[in-house]
Each structure stands twice: as structure tokens, then as C-alpha cells.
Curated annotation (Swiss-Prot):
It holds the Pfam family Herpes_BTRF1. This is Uncharacterized gene 23 protein. The gene is 23. Belongs to the herpesviridae BTRF1 family. InterPro entries: Herpes_BTRF1.
Length: 401
């Protein structure tokens, strides 16, 4: 059973992820994630849940699919929301309404899968009231705005809830809804961090470096760390770690993954750095200042190369090639990474953009100077000098494939 907000306002209706009140206002969930907003081309860092109902096909008033055959870019939404992002047949649950009864919105948005059941989304969210279910503007917290709502233990089905601490038997009518008022909990803290690459504290820099060296020593024993963190890192090392930004260093795959997620952390984007901290909390080595400086140098190199790649891919994606391009690169991981990238950000010439991008990215990752790369590339395609508005979400995608 989940906590939910029971809205007893007469004539309230659950419509496509939002509750329509007689006053023409809407009650809906607001998800806090700048990355999610960028993935859906929405401004700001707060995304109304009804936007997901609008973008994904099918579903009902209280749930929508998290899989789209028409727009593969939406798979990023499932990665950001679901604890099981590889399950295509996932449903987002916001609440329910039986016939003309009161509407119940779950306190936290839920994701339902056939294999893993129901779990809360990974991002913080809250329930608000506003004039437009597709915008976060003008919204206020539902608990303040709605007099006829209460926090309840709720189930979509008729359920008997017994307080075992009372140490006595209780009988309930199967026809009565179970409703137990609870005090609202402390709102979740925002996970969005400072704007990109602001200076960090010395303690944070040391922690990131310690994680890097600890990851180089091996995977932590599974009996010494949370199973969820261990599994997440094991899966992401194989499935979300295709591009090696610093091949000359011959670092371990988990160290490469850590570099990428430290970059995401310092950009203020969603990341799995907390899983690294949980996994290696008992194995952090003491470091000298030179080791911390070395890590920051490696991180800076990875950052520069990732930015160079995005700059070049913007130009490649906008080009219609006049001649057929053949790649001399035989790295299957890099080819697969570019296939994933161009599925999310389709190029003007998919057939030729793929081999061209694979070869150029290989050159960048081997340490070629940015000016040298640009001089070489502009012999074949026109360079897009203006920064695209989607650069940050593209960076997230590049570091996650």
C-alpha cells in the first residue's frame, strides 16, 4: 500500500494525469529535474506529470506507458524515472478514481512493471494546484490550496489495514474505503545542483578522487556494499559506458564510468555518483595532493573531449553528405554508441553521418587538438559555430550511452 492524497472535492475528475476541479484548476504532480525538462524540450527544472501523458501514446486517466515506438528519444525519460529502465513495458502511475468517488493521487509517482512490480520514481516530486496542467507556472502546494484533501494510506483495491501495535482485533466492512490520516512528511530535498562547473569544495574534490582510485582497485565485495549499488554499477559499466574518453590511460571500465558521472554531477545533471559512494564507502584510500591534482587533470581532459565531441556531432548531424562515407574504424562499441546517439538526435543524413562521426570521435578521444580537428572536419562539412540549445541534454546522452 502507498501513501496518497485523497481529494474529496465534489465533481473532481481524474483526466490524463491531472485532477480537474470544478473551479477549473488542476491538481497534478510536479517532477523536479532539469535533465528531464531538457529531454522533453520544456523550460525550467520542474516538469508537470501530465506532459508525460501528452508525449506518450496510450494509457488511461491514471497511468501512461513509458515506451514510445514513434519517438525513441523518450527512452531517456524511462532512464531518468524508472529504477528498472531496461523494462520497456513500464507504466507511470499517478493515481486512480473509482466511478464518481473521490480521487486519490499517489504521494510519489510510481512505475509499474510486470517483472518488478511497483516502485517509486527516482526523482523528487510534489503535488501542486495550478491553472494549467502543462506548466509549472502559478502552482502552489496542494495541502495549502485544497481544504478537502488528506494524506491517506491507500490501495487501488478494497483493502483491510490493521494496526498491529494496537494489539487487538479489528473488523472492517469490505465496502468502506480505508483512510488513515497521516502527518505530511518533510518534502524531498532538490537534487538539482549548482549551474555547470562552479568551483567545488576541497573535500568534494578529494572524495571524487578517492572514489576514482578505489574503483581502480576492483569491484567491492558484494557482501560489503548495498546490493542495489553493486548491481547498478555492474550494469552501467557494460551498458552505459561505450565511449572511452581517455583511452591512453588504460583505466578500468568502472573508473571511466566514475569520470562520466563526476562530470554529470558537476554539471548538475542526474547521475549515479551516490551508488559509487555507497559501494566504496568502506574502501576509500588516503590520497596525497598530487593524486587529487592528477584526478582533476584527467577529469578536465575527459570534459574537454566530451565538449569537442558534442560540437562536432552538431555539425555532422546537420550535414547532408554528397558522397558515400566509409569508416576505417573497427571499434564495435563506438559504432553502437553512435547508433544510440543518432537514434535520440536524428541526423540529416543517417547513412553517412554514422561512419563519419565514428572516425572523428575516435580521433578526438585519441587526444587530437580541437583546432586541428576543426580544420580537418571543415574540409568536408560546414561547421556549426553557434551553440545548440540542446547541448546539455546531448552531453547527458553522450555520457550515458
Amino acid at each position: 500500500m502507498e501513501q496518497g492524497l485523497k481529494i474529496s472535492t465534489p465533481n473532481a475528475k481524474l483526466v490524463r494525469g491531472a485532477v480537474l476541479l470544478p473551479s477549473d484548476k488542476y491538481v497534478f504532480h510536479l517532477i523536479q529535474s532539469r535533465t528531464l525538462c531538457m529531454a522533453l524540450s520544456m523550460p525550467g527544472e520542474y516538469l508537470p506529470a501530465p506532459v508525460l501523458f501528452d508525449r506518450f501514446e496510450g494509457g488511461s486517466s491514471g497511468e501512461c506507458s513509458l515506451h514510445s515506438r514513434q519517438n525513441v528519444c523518450l527512452y531517456l525519460v524511462r532512464i531518468l524515472l524508472s529504477k528498472h529502465p531496461y523494462v520497456l513495458n513500464s507504466q507511470l502511475l499517478v493515481g486512480y478514481q473509482h466511478r464518481q468517488e473521490a480521487v486519490v493521487l499517489y504521494k510519489q509517482l510510481l512505475v509499474k512493471t510486470k517483472d518488478f512490480g511497483i516502485s517509486e520514481i527516482k526523482l523528487p516530486c510534489s503535488i501542486v494546484v495550478g491553472p494549467n496542467p502543462m506548466s509549472a507556472e502559478g502552482t502552489v502546494q496542494a495541502e495549502r490550496e485544497l481544504p478537502s484533501c488528506e494524506l491517506v494510506i491507500t490501495s487501488e483495491f478494497k483493502t483491510v489495514w490493521i494496526n498491529e501495535s494496537a494489539n487487538q482485533e479489528k473488523e472492517f466492512s469490505p465496502h468502506d474505503a480505508i483512510s488513515i490520516p497521516l502527518a505530511p512528511g518533510t518534502p524531498s530535498k532538490p537534487i538539482i545542483k549548482q549551474p555547470p562547473f562552479l568551483p567545488i569544495s576541497k573535500e568534494t574534490a578529494i572524495l571524487h578522487a578517492q572514489l576514482f582510485y578505489a574503483a581502480g582497485a576492483g569491484f567491492p565485495p558484494i557482501h560489503n556494499c548495498p546490493a542495489s549499488a553493486f548491481t547498478t554499477l555492474a550494469v552501467m559499466c557494460k551498458s552505459h559506458n561505450s565511449i572511452n574518453l581517455v583511452p591512453e590511460l588504460e583505466i578500468k571500465p568502472r573508473q571511466l564510468l566514475l569520470l562520466k558521472h563526476v562530470l554529470l554531477t558537476r554539471m548538475g545533471l542526474e547521475n549515479c555518483l551516490q551508488d559509487f559512494i555507497q559501494a566504496y564507502a568502506e574502501r576509500l584510500p588516503p590520497l596525497a595532493d598530487e593524486q587529487v591534482k592528477y584526478f582533476e587533470k584527467v577529469l578536465g581532459t575527459a570534459k574537454d573531449r566530451a565538449e569537442d565531441i558534442i560540437f562536432i556531432l552538431n555539425s555532422v548531424g546537420a550535414t547532408s553528405f554528397t558522397n558515400r562515407i566509409c569508416s576505417s574504424n573497427t571499434d564495435p562499441m563506438l559504432t553502437k554508441a553512435m547508433q544510440k546517439y543518432f537514434l535520440m538526435f536524428p541526423p540529416a543524413d543517417p547513412i553517412n553521418a554514422l561512419p563519419f562521426a565514428v572516425d572523428i570521435i575516435s580521433i578526438i578521444c585519441q587526444g587530437a587538438n580541437f583546432n586541428t580537428v576543426v580544420l580537418f572536419v571543415q574540409r568536408y562539412i560546414k561547421i556549426q559555430e553557434r551553440a545548440a540549445k540542446t547541448n546539455q541534454i546531448k552531453m547527458f546522452a553522450l555520457l550515458s550511452i
